[in-house]
Amino acid sequence: MHKYQTHWVEHSIVKILSSTGKKHIALMAGGMSAEREVSLVSSEGVSKALIELGYRVTFIDMGADIAVRLQEIKPDIVFNCLHGTYGEDGCLPGLLNIMRIPYTHSGVLSSALAFNKIHSRIWFLTNNINMAESIVVNKSDNIKNDPMKRPYVIKPLAQGSSIGVEVIFAEDDFNFADYDFPYGDQVIIEQYIKGQGRELQVAVLNGKALGALEIKLLKNRFYDYETKYTEGFADHLCPAPLPANLYEKLLIESEKIYKTMNCKGPARAEFILEEQTNKLYALEINTHPGMMPLSIVPEIAAYAGINFTNLIEEIIKTASFES
């Protein structure tokens, strides 16, 4: 199991990437979260697209002095390319609301809800979104045996990119009493959809589902961090090979989640399809989907006729702050 940590960084790193342009975009990336490297790689393609679109671009690797840096450079818009803690969890949108700087991606409540697996689950179920059975386990519970019948999934409360996610199968030599809660004192224990469960991903932009793809695992047992970011570990079947009525239902459910959570800009909804019953189980909605070469939202957007540069332009158009 990988152990990724949040690193406290005192000072932001500011780099001018383009000094002329129609508007000044601060491209926020890196930061202090466990997903720092993913964010930095995502920002590379985004920066090229912004410059191609004619924007003045300043890159900011976010540190604790971010408010001071933003006051100094005075951007017209912040493109939030951060993943994980402080960027994806509602913290940065809260600061930008106070500073009245328009920003891309979802706002405070939407981001915070989506990032926290307990609260997003409550929200989903309240809005009649089907999910697999799950329970919350606290470190202080001192549970010695399996908290749920195997197979089950262990999910950290607030991590992205499948960091810290483990699937415990019946044959695994695993003792829950030895689990050390590496990402906080609470975890979600979720039923693993057995057999022919199919991993489905939907890209949503401005409330409209652009399409869906299916993840076919080639090496690892589940869609973990390594599989997500290593070429050759999974195939993407785009569009997802589903009957027309089921494909349409998948898009409608994704739009419902997006709208009930009041998301903004791009998002990626994740589902498991139980093939024996054709039942869809929602996993989560990601309000800060990756923008890397292997990333799903750009791939689905391309299938829908939106190239990467135009996708970034559409995201910029959604920039606003909450008053």
Curated annotation (Swiss-Prot):
An individual GO BP term: peptidoglycan biosynthetic process
Pfam families referenced in this protein's UniProt entry, alphabetically: Dala_Dala_lig_C, Dala_Dala_lig_N
UniProt keyword annotations, A-Z: ATP-binding, Cell shape, Cell wall biogenesis/degradation, Cytoplasm, Ligase, Magnesium, Manganese, Metal-binding, Nucleotide-binding, Peptidoglycan synthesis
Binding site for ATP: 147-199
Protein residues bound to Mg(2+) 1: E270, E284
Gene3D superfamilies, sorted: 3.40.50.20, ATP-grasp fold, A domain (3.30.1490.20), ATP-grasp fold, B domain (3.30.470.20)
Substrates-to-products reaction catalysed: 2 D-alanine + ATP = D-alanyl-D-alanine + ADP + phosphate + H(+)
SUPFAM superfamilies linked: Glutathione synthetase ATP-binding domain-like, PreATP-grasp domain
UniProt key word Metal-binding: yes
Binding site for Mg(2+) 2: E284, N286
Similarity comment: Belongs to the D-alanine--D-alanine ligase family.
Its biological purpose: Cell wall formation.
Name of the featured protein: D-alanine--D-alanine ligase
